[in-house]
UniProtKB/Swiss-Prot annotation:
Domain PDZ: 78-163
GO cellular component, one term: anchoring junction
Start and end residues of each stretch annotated as Disordered: 1-46, 212-237, 339-373, 413-456, 673-718, 862-919, 1056-1126, 1341-1393, 1411-1431, 1488-1510, 1525-1548, 1637-1665, 1688-1733, 1838-1925
Protein name, entry field: Rho GTPase-activating protein 21
Rho-GAP domain location: 1140-1332
Membrane topology: Peripheral membrane protein
Major location (coarse): Golgi
Database matches in PROSITE patterns: PDZ, PH_DOMAIN, RHOGAP
Biased composition regions of type Polar residues, renumbered to the chain: 217-237, 348-373, 413-429, 708-718, 1345-1355, 1525-1543, 1646-1662, 1872-1889, 1898-1911
Gene this chain is encoded by: arhgap21
Domain PH: 920-1033
Extent of Basic and acidic residues compositional bias: 863-884, 1097-1119, 1691-1705
Length: 1935
């Protein structure tokens, strides 16, 4: 060992030094051996082990050992557990357990280069099988290390080479897990472990059952064990855990501390007050242990082998679990089934066949098949596996870990025997640590948990272990061997009463020991099932590897012996809840375990003393801390208890432990129960297990947990000696204990007695134990560590569920610092430091503030549920009533320790209180203060008890509340409040969760009053608590008395409350004001804690965050007032979050003005949902949303975002939306709603933005901040629109109506203001930085800029969202989709509010769908403004077409329309003349002369031509009406009705009507671009005249469906891939083109539109034009069939006259575009909006491509669909959301048709192409687009060649051809129509020249077909008839 030590100060070297480590090792080793899988055992033949002779060098042997604990298969463990449950707990039962018993395998961790080991050929990974010829099987790790260290100059090792080591092979990874500190220390001669026949059943079972947690590196043994919670894959699956435990460097030193060991007999509970001498404790253990644990004496430098031997309680002591004689438990290589190989030898032997003394300590998990359950001697088994299995069977029975855990759970649920609990614990506790782990002191490895944590987490574990031998022996556990190994403790427990639970502890790391004697489960123990707090303590010790450290402080045997000795003496009786409460071990384990995952480090290293706790903790640690099943308290308590109990182990160490416990929270409870847990370790044991476990556990915990293993060994003794026995109060989980143990006065006395416990080990009956406790309390008082303080200190802060947190483990903080009642605890901690490792964990435990981060996690997890409870419990249990169960104390946070005890361990408290623990600690600062009760004890009403910011000065035993800071104040100036003096003597102080939802609030309960104080943060709160506790506890006697009174009162209240309201809430007792306050906090916060689960540090931390943020006092009083006000206001609403004013909503942590729900939801979405497609668009599950709302309304401000229910982002987003929807006062407030709407309608974009910003700034703080926050969030979401498809418009669509609304549901507003709502929200999202920036001087982005920004995004048709901005101008930004349309119509086109309102209605109806569609279209389209342009063009075209239609409803009119369209194109080209053109167009339309000499004017109609089928004026009018209806119905029924009315009226004035119709169609197209485009396309594709209104409506409905699909696709973030632009980039471009044209056309046609629509509706077409455009999309498409026909005819004539050249150019451009994929550019060219043309061409081209794709698809679909029934069309329309593209596609098609008209041959090709496309269309949109592109290229090429001649022909044939080309245009979207019209206009001439006959044939015949098809029959199948014919004819023409 010296060599190892020197070479690698790792486990072997170091661990031998720690007796505790040894113990852990032994236990672990045994357990491991037991863990060997039976299967391996039988068929396994060990290759002969290799013998290596090492010569000791100056540095030692030059190798380090690792302790690897192999756990039995769960099945085996389960069997054992079953056996135990069946009553097979005798030695025989124990034998089966041997196979279940974790096997300590010791393997070479490291070989020093050039060292003796290296020279000898010892290799890393060699498993030690024999040391000097002595098998390590049955020896604990510490024993093996001791053997090695004690070896002479030469060391002969029999090792199993790593490659041959089954265990290592099985646990190749686990065996070498990190985090295991090598053991350093001197191990005295460690006697060989007694034969495996030891009835380790219980302890081994526990160990085995417990998943091995890898102890932190701090504790080599425990660490290793903890570090390997791995089941051997090769071995039986049941062998769930194998842990490599590194023995702490100096467990031996720790071992020396005296520990009060309580031996738990079934019948009698005895407290062993170990003398300070480790040897005595060891001797006690040895006595108990008997020969079996003889070897453990040797471990870790225990000079006295007999000492090392643990006295095992008689088997009878273990009721149902076969109790291994003390010798087995102690001597058997540690408690329970771990081979006593210290350096891993024992384990390695267990792991491998005894014959193979594999040097490599990395054992593989071998679960020896159950062999003889009699004496399990490895020599008796052929295979190591078999041996281990048998041993495991003996130890654990056949139970698997899971089985044991299950039985443990059952035990915790049922007040079952500890034996049963043990199995349950084994199986139930996820966290398990082999005994070695548990024994190995884990200074920092395991996170300690406060008692409350442990209660929350492992009440069952705690309960299951009465006081585990380790815990009981914790006093002796301080002895290095014990300290070294929690296992030793476990052995004590196993061998004694603890065999049951010890085994579990090892397996779990929280050993779930059914008390073999009693058969009580640990849970039962917590419930008070067993009267043996000591057992429980030992159990706790076993549970947490922390006890591993405890063993270090104590000789493992003595530790075990001490613990065991008590165990046999007292039966495992159901401990009174008080007793249970008193059981610090449990508490300690819980605290120890608390947040830590059972990494060996924390568990075993943290508290050597709390070995059993440590063991217990391991279970809790790895898995238990988060496993509420065991019971929140128990879970927490286990870890904490490990620490606490370790404290309990050493009387003085326990003092430390109590402090630690206070830090741990549960430890506080434990200590509190014991009052002087440390001092009264014996006393603690004597009351129940308190003294025993408190002392032993505390010491061990301190020594081991805090110290490194070596330090633990050394310090453990000092810890035991020096640590006042801190009675660690266990906190039973709120629901776990059937009866919460109420600490009996004896417990309290015991706590107090902890100090007074005599150093000498004494066997005391329960009464004697109580007396000892009292003595110790007295001693503690004498020593200055007040027993009351200790007990209170032992009470964990309510917030410190994580008292065993790493912080505690790491930081050696005096318990006093942690324990507000630091009088006792501080000395305890001071004493503990001898074990450096131990002190850290101890301190961590003691200092809940050290655990703040962790403790809050667990505490919040648990402490919300039972934070107060644990604190109060601890306080009550410790201070007032030892009787109080930890649970009660826990639940009674008011009862909690004296004011100082609960939660005063905040980091600041640490700073303040640590130094001031025993002196008047003056603290001052601003606190928010509220008086809960008056002097009469009456509750102050909420109104009478407002939160006030006071400058609080703590002087002596009084708090002075001052209005202003008279001295330094870290807080904001105190609010005015008379200076008050609050006497804090004997006050109870705890963290308040129920009284207020505020965070960082602590409750100060004096004899007559109760106050709430809110600190700025948790640290400050804890500092205050600590300081108050310290000052309040200055007079220990008075404080103790007062505290007891208060605690009694609190307990009564709590009991009353609990009786009335069930423990689960852990609400404070109802009875008194205090109770009420407690209860309320419990209701409000504890459920939250529960939700979070006591075991979840994350949840706790989050909860803390929330708590902090929510309650951290704002620096300003007003904020504080609001925050304070909110929680209270919410209280009435039960923390209502939904349906309450923003002011009343729980504030976010970081912003009091932002509701917590908003903050949480936004953060969750930002964290996880920014890339979620359709986030906020896709609704969440209503049930989940409702459930979450109800939960939040219940006051659950602590949101566990890790909860599965918070995983569904859609639910979260829906929850957020629901929150805003349910706000009584909308986010934009009812008061300012109209102002926002009006501001949004401001035409000047800049002024609009400024006005909006002014209004936003005028919003109330909460509304403003929330809006700011939400806008930033939505902005972040929109920034990821590429992935989530939620552009600002989509988000605005989602949130606009939700945010911008009035409380009263006004449908009119909803419809009319929807665009404004969308626009406002969209603007906020887009302009968030500007709106919420402090720089108001900056000019807002202009509307055009905004529109461009919008435009940059594929904006859905949020015309209503962007109407204001869009209306401001027709810039490309304006053109951005609906926004630009609305902007145009609104701004550029004129205010047109009527139109705007109507448009808003329409757009609002269609917004969602159209937006989505447009988004996708826009996505292909660089900007949505193109769509607007297209809309404009469509409007222009529509106007022109309409104008033309009135003139010519006949072919001539169509020709005129075409000419007009061409002229419109020209007009588009000439924007300046657009108005004139429009007028001319009107005239032309009115004249309906194909020769209207206004080609420029008609140049726009060409766009229309695409849209307008050459129909008679009547038909066009009808079609317009129908279109309006359809487009309106498709786009917006209201709009359609309006449009229909208007249009039908204007139809008389065909130009206006048509203009409006076109506008309407345009609007529809816009809308339909999003929502009704498909229907519009169908309609457009079909001449509306031909299409009956029904068909139109059907088509529109189909279009709507398509829109819905598209919107769905969009919401899904998927591009609309049905028949749309998406499929066809051309269509998309055409859409863009159409929009561009629309915008362009709109500009010229604004007046026309105004006229056509009626100036109000069309007013400058700003809104109406948008509406019209949308309508025109549908109407255009529909009417464009007629109009386009008419116009095409007219325009063709016109174009022939005037626009042929332009048209030719346009056609050439269009053809080129088609060739280039810029088919839309043709429309642009045709449009002649040259400035926009290039970009528009590109975009339009893209759109055309998309649209052509869509149109081709739509056309094919239409062709087929037209033939199909209307519903079929609907289906296809649905499929054709593309219909947007489709409309435009028709436009494009019309362009193509124009081109095709130019090329008759291409027409045929088109037919073939169409045929090709038809099959492709439905299935292959891309192929269609490609095909369209190809066809276009062909068409464009042919058309280009034929352009000029065709143009002439077109003019001639325009009348004929136009109808044909228009039919395609109807299919195309407005932009397509415009393009088609343009192309038709421009191409019409060319087509007229070249293909006129064909086109005419196709067009005319097709038009006739279309018209005929458009007949009602055709309408019935509009897509099929008109679609097919129109699409094909036009499409073919186009092709």
């Amino acid at each position: 060992m010296a060599t190892r030590r020197a070479t690698v100060p790792e486990q072997q070297q170091q661990q031998p030094s720690s007796p505790g480590s040894e113990i852990s090792k032994n236990k672990d080793g045994q357990e491991q051996s037991e863990m060997v899988s039976p299967t391996e055992e039988e068929g396994f033949c060990w290759p002969g082990p290799k013998s290596v002779a090492l010569r000791r060098a100056s540095e030692g042997f030059g190798f380090t050992l690792r302790h690897f604990i192999v756990y039995p298969p769960e099945s085996a463990v389960h069997t054992t557990v079953k056996d135990e449950e069946n009553g097979n707990r005798g030695v025989n039962a124990g034998r089966p357990r041997n196979r279940l018993e974790p096997m300590d395998t010791i393997f070479v961790k490291q070989v020093k280069e050039g060292g003796p080991a290296h020279e000898a050929g010892l290799c890393t990974g060699d498993r030690i099988i024999k040391v000097n010829g002595e098998s390590v099987i049955g020896k604990t790790y510490s024993q093996v290390i001791a053997l090695i260290q004690n070896s002479d100059s030469t060391l002969e090792l029999s090792v199993m080479p790593k490659d041959e080591d089954i265990l290592q092979l099985a646990y190749s990874q686990d065996a070498y897990l990190k985090g295991n500190d090598s053991y350093s220390g001197n191990a005295q001669n460690i006697p060989e472990p007694p034969p495996i026949c030891y009835p380790r059943t219980k302890p081994a079972a526990s160990v085995m059952a417990q998943p091995v947690e890898v102890p932190p590196s701090g504790t080599s043994l425990t660490k290793q064990q903890s570090s390997r919670p791995v089941r051997t894959a090769t071995t039986q699956p049941d062998r769930s855990y194998r842990v490599e435990i590194q023995v702490p460097p100096s467990p031996t030193d720790i071992v020396k501390s005296n520990t009060a060991v309580c031996v738990c007999n079934e019948a009698v509970r005895t407290v062993i007050l170990p003398s300070e001498k480790v040897v005595d404790l060891s001797s006690n253990r040895t006595n108990r242990a008997g020969p079996l644990h003889r070897t453990e004496e040797v471990r870790y430098g225990l000079a006295d082998p007999s000492m090392l031997k643990r006295t095992t309680s008689p088997p009878s002591s273990t009721p149902s679990v076969p109790m291994v004689p003390a010798s087995r438990q102690f001597d058997n290589a540690g408690v329970i089934g771990k081979p006593p190989s210290y350096g891993g030898h024992s384990e390695s032997m267990f792991s491998t066949r005894p014959s193979q003394a594999e040097e490599s300590p990395s054992p593989t998990n071998h679960y020896a098949s159950p062999g003889s359950h009699q004496q399990i001697d490895w020599r008796n088994y052929k295979t190591y596996k078999e041996y281990i299995d048998n041993r495991r069977m003996q130890m654990y029975g056949c139970r698997t870990i899971q089985e044991r855990l299950d039985s443990l759970r059952a035990a915790s649920q049922n007040t079952t025997d500890y034996d049963q609990m043990l199995p349950n614990r084994s199986s139930g506790q996820v966290r398990r640590r082999s005994t070695s782990h548990d024994r190995v002191p884990q200074s920092v490895q395991m996170r300690q948990r406060s008692v409350s944590q442990e209660r929350l987490e492992d009440p069952v574990l705690m309960k299951e272990w009465p006081r585990s031998a380790s815990q009981d022996t914790l006093t002796s556990l301080t002895v290095a061997p014990r300290n070294h190994r929690s296992e030793s403790w476990d052995y004590l427990t196993r061998k004694e009463d603890f065999d049951q639970f010890i085994v579990d502890t090892q397996s779990n790391g929280e050993q779930k020991h059914n008390y073999k004697w009693t058969g009580f489960t640990e849970q039962d123990d917590q419930r008070g099932i067993y009267e043996i707090p000591r057992q429980h303590s030992f159990h706790m010790s076993l549970r947490s590897p922390n006890y591993t450290m405890a063993p270090l402080p104590y000789p493992s045997d003595s530790r075990r012996a001490g613990t065991r000795v008590l165990a046999p003496a007292r039966p495992l009786q159901k401990v009174h809840p008080d007793l249970k409460t008193i059981q610090p071990t449990r508490n300690f384990q819980n605290s120890y375990r608390s947040p830590h995952p059972r990494p060996a480090v924390s568990e075993r290293l943290v508290f050597p003393i709390s070995k059993s706790n440590s063991v217990k903790i391991p279970a809790t640690y790895a898995s238990k801390p988060y496993s509420p099943s065991v019971g929140s308290e128990d879970g927490i308590v286990k870890d904490q208890k490990a620490v606490n109990y370790i404290h309990v182990s050493g009387p003085q160490n326990f003092q430390r432990k109590p402090q630690t416990e206070s830090a741990l929270g549960f430890q506080l409870d434990s200590l509190k129960t014991s009052t002087s847990a440390s001092s009264s370790s014996p006393a603690h044991t004597k009351p129940a297990k308190q003294a025993k476990h408190s002392t032993a556990t505390s010491q061990n915990v301190d020594g081991k947990k805090t110290q490194s293993p070596e330090a633990n060994a050394g310090d453990s003794n000092s810890v035991l000696t020096s640590i006042d026995q801190v009675v660690l109060r266990e906190k039973p989980s709120p629901g776990q204990q059937t009866s919460q143990p109420i600490r009996q006065p004896s417990y309290i006395f015991a706590v107090s007695d902890v100090e007074g416990a005599s150093d000498t080990t004494c066997w005391l009956p329960n009464d004697a134990r109580r007396e000892v406790h009292i003595k110790r309390i007295e001693q503690k008082k004498a020593s200055g560590s007040d027993s009351p303080g200790d007990s209170l200190a032992s009470i964990p802060f309510i917030d410190e569920p994580t008292s065993p947190s790493i912080d505690h483990e790491i930081a050696n903080i005096p318990a006093s610092a942690v324990i507000s009642i630091s009088v006792q605890p501080l000395p305890t901690i001071t004493t503990v430091p001898p074990s450096p490792t131990s002190p850290v964990p101890l301190i961590r435990r003691h200092f809940s503030h050290d655990h703040d981060s962790i403790r809050p996690s667990i505490l919040e997890v648990n402490s919300k549920t039972e934070r107060s409870k644990s604190c109060d419990e601890g306080l009550d249990d410790y201070k007032d009533e030892g009787k109080l169960s930890l649970k009660q104390g826990s639940s009674l946070k008011g009862i909690k320790a004296r004011e100082n005890v609960p939660s005063s361990e905040d980091s600041e408290s640490r700073k303040d209180s640590s130094s001031d623990v025993f002196s008047d600690s003056n603290k001052e600062g601003f606190l928010y203060f509220r008086q809960l009760t008056t002097e009469k004890g009456k509750r102050v009403s909420g109104s009478m008890r407002p939160w006030k910011q006071m400058y609080v000065v703590l002087r002596g035993s009084a708090l002075y509340l001052q209005k202003d800071k008279k001295e330094q104040s870290g807080h904001s100036s105190a609010q005015s409040d008379e200076e008050q003096l609050i006497g804090i003597n004997g006050c109870l102080i705890d963290i308040s969760y129920s009284e207020t939802k505020r965070k960082n609030v602590f409750r100060l309960t004096t004899s007559d009053r109760e106050f709430l104080f809110q600190a700025e943060d948790r640290d400050d709160m804890l500092a205050w608590i600590k300081a108050i506790q310290e000052n309040g506890n200055l007079n220990d006697e008075q404080t103790d008395q007062a505290s007891r009174v208060l605690i009694s009162k609190r307990i009564k209240e709590y009991n009353t409350m609990m009786s009335s309201s069930s423990n689960k809430s852990e609400q404070s007792p109802k009875p008194s004001r205090q109770t009420l306050s407690i209860r309320q906090p419990f209701r409000a916060t504890k459920p939250e804690g529960k939700l979070q689960s006591p075991h979840s540090p994350k949840q706790e931390s989050e909860r803390r965050l929330f708590s902090k943020d929510d309650i951290s006092p704002p620096k300003d009083k007003g904020s504080w007032r609001r925050i304070m006000k909110k929680p209270f206001e919410k209280k009435p609403t039960t923390g209502g979050t939904f349906g309450v004013r923003l002011d009343d909503c729980p504030p976010a942590h970081n912003n009091k003005y932002v509701p917590l729900i908003v903050d949480v939801c936004c953060k969750l979405v930002e964290d996880r949902g920014l890339e979620t497609t359709g986030i906020y668009r896709v609704p969440g599950n209503n049930a989940a949303i409702s459930s979450m709302q109800e939960e939040l309304n219940k006051g659950s401000t602590d949101i566990d975002i890790q909860d599965d229910k918070w995983r569904d982002l859609n639910v979260i987003s829906s929850l957020l939306k629901s929150f805003f929807r349910k706000l009584p006062d909308p986010l934009f407030t009812n008061e300012k709603y109209n102002d926002f709407i009006e501001a949004n309608r401001t035409e000047d974009p800049v002024e609009r933005l400024k006005t909006l910003k002014r209004l936003i700034l005028d919003l109330p703080d909460h509304h403003y901040e929330t809006l700011k926050y939400l806008s930033a969030h939505l902005k972040a979401v929109a920034e990821n629109s590429e992935k989530n498809k939620m552009e600002p418009r989509n988000l605005a669509i989602v949130f606009g109506p939700t945010l911008v609304r009035t409380s009263e549901d006004n449908m009119t507003h909803m419809v009319t203001h929807m665009p404004d709502q969308y626009k406002i929200v969209e603007t906020l999202i887009q302009q968030h930085d500007w709106f919420f920036s402090e720089e108001s001087a900056d000019e807002p982005i202009t509307a055009v800029q905004e529109e461009s920004t919008v435009e940059s995004q594929p904006v859905p048709n949020i015309d209503h969202l962007l109407p204001n901005i869009g209306r401001t101008g027709l810039s490309p930004g304006d053109v951005s989709d609906s926004a630009s349309d609305s902007a145009k119509s609104k701004g550029s086109w004129g205010s047109g509010k009527d139109q705007y309102s109507r448009e808003l209605l329409v757009s609002s109806l269609f917004a969602a769908a159209s937006r989505k569609r447009k988004k996708q279209r826009d996505k292909p389209q660089p900007s949505s403004s193109e769509d607007e342009l297209d809309n404009v063009f469509y409007q222009k075209e529509l106007l022109q077409v309409e104008f033309q239609r009135p003139d010519k409803q006949n072919v001539d009119k169509d020709v005129d329309l075409k000419a007009n369209a061409l002229s419109l194109k020209d007009a588009d080209n000439i924007k300046g003349t657009n108005i004139i053109k429009e007028d001319k167009l009107e005239k032309d339309i009115m004249h309906s002369e194909a020769t209207s000499p206004c080609p420029p004017k008609l140049s726009e109609p060409p766009i229309v031509n695409h849209r307008l089928p050459p129909d008679d004026k009547n038909i066009p009018q009808i079609s317009f009406q129908m279109e309006e209806s359809m487009s309106d119905s498709g786009t917006m029924l209201s709009t359609s009705s309006q449009a229909s009315a208007q249009r039908s009226k204007p139809k008389v004035v065909s130009p206006e009507l048509k203009g409006s119709d076109f506008l309407t169609a345009d609007v529809s197209s816009i809308t339909s671009d999003y929502s009704t485009t498909s229907s519009t396309i169908y309609i457009v594709g079909l001449d509306q005249n031909l299409i009956s209104p029904e068909v139109q409506s059907v088509a529109e409905s189909k279009g709507e469906e398509a829109d819905d699909e598209r919107s769905e696709l969009i919401s899904e973030g998927r591009p609309m891939e049905t028949d749309s632009e998406n499929d066809f980039p051309i269509f998309a471009s055409s859409i863009a083109f159409d929009r561009q044209h629309r915008s362009k056309v709109e500009e010229p046609t604004r007046n026309v539109q105004v006229n056509s629509e009626g100036s109000p509706s069309c007013t400058e077409g700003s809104i109406t034009p948008r509406m019209d455009r949308r309508r025109f999309s549908s109407h255009k498409l529909i009417e464009c069939d007629t109009l386009s026909r008419k116009k095409s005819i007219r325009q063709k004539t016109d174009s022939e006259c005037s626009a042929e050249s332009k048209n030719e150019e346009t056609l050439s451009d269009a053809q080129e575009a088609v060739k280039k994929g810029r088919s839309l550019s043709i429309g642009d060219t045709t449009t002649n909006n040259e400035p926009e043309e290039p970009a528009w061409r590109i975009k339009i081209t893209e759109r055309l491509k998309l649209r052509l794709k869509a149109s081709a698809d739509d056309m094919f679909g239409i062709g087929s669909q037209k033939a199909q029934a209307a519903e079929t069309r609907k289906k296809k329309n649905i499929r054709r959301r593309h219909t947007l593209g489709g409309q435009r596609d028709f436009a494009e098609i019309s362009v193509l048709n124009a081109w095709k008209i130019n090329e008759p041959s291409s027409k045929e090709a088109e037919l073939s192409a169409v045929d090709r496309l038809k099959p492709k269309c439905p299935s292959q949109d891309l192929s269609i687009s490609d095909w369209l592109a190809r066809e276009r290229l062909r068409t464009s090429t042919s058309e280009l060649s034929m352009v000029e001649p065709e143009e002439k022909r077109i003019s001639d044939a325009t009348s004929q051809k136009e109808p044909a080309s228009p039919s395609p245009p109807p299919a195309s979207s407005p932009s397509q129509v415009s393009t088609a019209i343009v192309t038709a206009g421009s191409e019409s001439p060319s087509q007229g020249t070249a293909p006129p006959p064909d086109d005419q044939m196709n067009g005319d015949s097709f038009q006739s077909k279309n018209k005929n098809n458009f007949s009602p029959a055709v309408d019935a199948h509009p897509h099929k008839l008109s679609g097919t014919q129109v699409v094909r004819s036009r499409f073919y023409q186009y092709l």
